[in-house]
Structures are given as structure tokens and as C-alpha cells.
Amino acid sequence: MTTLQQQKIRIRLKAFDHRLLDTSCDKIVETAKRTNASPVGPIPLPTRRRIYCVLRSPHVDKDSREHFETRTHRRIVDIYQPSPKTIDALMKLDLPAGVDIEVKL
């Protein structure tokens, strides 16, 4: 690496469904490869589990409870040496509604 800082786009993806997340990551990586950028990833981050404890009965039986959980899966994709063509292609990319995307330049 040179002393100059390289240009990099960091894309963070979050979703409840890991299959949807993986297909979105594959689309992003393929788009970056088509425009001659060098993608790194998808890098899996730890899955966050959120557990909710709810009473089963509205009146008595405090000991009877039910647990629900949501799992948030996360991935990072880094794209090095992006061109304006890469950025345009990523902006036009159609991704599912269940995937949350954050882009940092």
C-alpha cells in the first residue's frame, strides 16, 4: 500500500433473514466486479439476538412465560478503487425491502 489513502466504499447490511442478506451481498459484489472495482467480502459480523419475555396469562400464573426472539444478521462489504461507474451501478441496484443498507464513502 502506498502512503496515500485509498478510496473505499463500506457497505453495511442488516436483515432478519440471512438468505435475503446473502443474496443482496452477492448482487453488490457482482455489480462491483462488473465495473472493475475490487470488492472484499461479504464479511459476516456477529448476529444480535434480542429476546422478549412475555407473560402467557393476562391475570395470574407469573411462572408461566413465553420467550420470543429476533435475530439481526449483519454483513460488511468493502469496495476498493470505486469509479463513478461503480457508484452509479450501486445506486441503481434493486435490493429487497427487508435489507437495511448503510453506505460510507
UniProtKB/Swiss-Prot annotation:
Gene3D superfamilies: Ribosomal protein S10 domain
Record flagged with keyword Transcription regulation: no
Gene Ontology annotations for the cellular component aspect, listed alphabetically: ribonucleoprotein complex; ribosome
GO MF terms, alphabetically ordered: structural constituent of ribosome; tRNA binding
UniProt cross-references to PROSITE patterns, sorted A to Z: RIBOSOMAL_S10
Lineage: Bacteria, Bacillati, Cyanobacteriota, Cyanophyceae, Acaryochloridales
Species of the source: Acaryochloris marina (strain MBIC 11017)
Keywords: Ribonucleoprotein, Ribosomal protein
Keyword Cytoplasm: no
Signal sequence, start to end: none
Protein name (database record): Small ribosomal subunit protein uS10
Purpose: Involved in the binding of tRNA to the ribosomes.
Quaternary structure and interacting proteins, as annotated: Part of the 30S ribosomal subunit.
Similarity-based family: Belongs to the universal ribosomal protein uS10 family.
Any single GO BP term: translation
InterPro entries reported in the protein's UniProt record: Ribosomal_uS10, Ribosomal_uS10_CS, Ribosomal_uS10_dom, Ribosomal_uS10_dom_sf
